C-alpha cells in the first residue's frame, strides 16, 4: 500500500508539472497599440467560454465617428456586419495548444477581414498573430490597468 501511495505521488507530480507547461490563459483586459504611433487604440477583454478563448472590444480611443455616432464594423460581413465596434467579439474560438492558443480567428474591424489567429503571453505582454495563408503579422498588446 505504501508503494502504491508513492507511485501515485510520483504520477501526480508528473502530471501536475505537465499542466504547468500548458497555455496560461491570458484572461483580462489588454490594450491594443498602434504599430506606428505607439498610441493605445482600444481595450480588449479576453475571456474563456466553453474551454475556448474569446476577446471583445470594450473601449476605443476614438469611439465615435465624425457624426458623433458609435463606430460600426461597416466592412465586416455576416453576423458582425454594421455591429458597434465597442462590444464586438473579435477573437473567437481559440483552443489551448502547448503554451499558446490557436485554431480560432481574429477580425480586424478596420477592414472587416477575418484571419486565422494564435495568441500567447511573453514577458507579461500578449502576442497576437493573424495569419493569411503563409503570411502573418504579430501585434503586441499590453495588460490594461
Model-based region annotation:
Residues 34-107, 112-117:
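Central antiparallel beta-sheet cores of small beta-barrel/beta-sandwich binding domains
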Residues 120-124, 142-145:
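A short, sequence-level motif marking secondary-structure junctions
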Residues 108-109, 113-119, 125-137:
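Short, exposed beta-strand-loop hairpins at the edges of beta-sheets
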Residues 1-8:
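Bacterial N-terminal signal peptides that target proteins for export
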